Amino acid sequence: MAENQYYGTGRRKSSAARVFIKPGSGNIVINQRSLEQYFGRETARMVVRQPLELTDMVGKFDLYITVKGGGISGQAGAIRHGITRALMEYDETLRGELRKAGFVTRDARQVERKKVGLRKARRRPQFSKR
């Protein structure tokens, strides 16, 4: 492992991302694929870049990311959380502005479980009066 490498773990919904950042030219590799190849949606790419753009670190780090579980949006959120934690490990003074933007807090919202007697978590079967 490189001596000047910083690490952050990010989680969102059922996704978990491991993020390694080291000084470089702004290369982002996710599961051995480029950011553009991995995320087809522009919104997901934007979410991943948010902490870097906020802290003006876009071309300063190479990112190596492995992410598992969940869907596109959950994985993008997990990566964002991981990048945020890695940046804070690199420079603790960034914590304030990252916290203000809401990137430091782990989004605790999970899928609500399906209940017995209901069709989904809250959707009830149709009610017939007579």
Swiss-Prot record:
GO terms for molecular function: RNA binding; structural constituent of ribosome. PANTHER family: RIBOSOMAL PROTEIN S9, SMALL RIBOSOMAL SUBUNIT PROTEIN US9M. Belongs to the universal ribosomal protein uS9 family. Keywords: Ribonucleoprotein, Ribosomal protein. SUPFAM superfamilies: Ribosomal protein S5 domain 2-like (SSF54211). The keyword Ribosomal protein applies. Gene3D superfamilies: 3.30.230.10. The keyword Isomerase does not apply. InterPro entries: Ribosomal_Su5_D2-typ_SF, Ribosomal_uS9, Ribosomal_uS9_bac/plastid, Ribosomal_uS9_CS, Ribsml_uS5_D2-typ_fold_subgr. It comes from Serratia proteamaculans (strain 568). This is Small ribosomal subunit protein uS9. One of its GO terms (biological process) is translation. It comes from the Bacteria. Pfam families: Ribosomal_S9. GO terms for cellular component: cytosolic small ribosomal subunit.
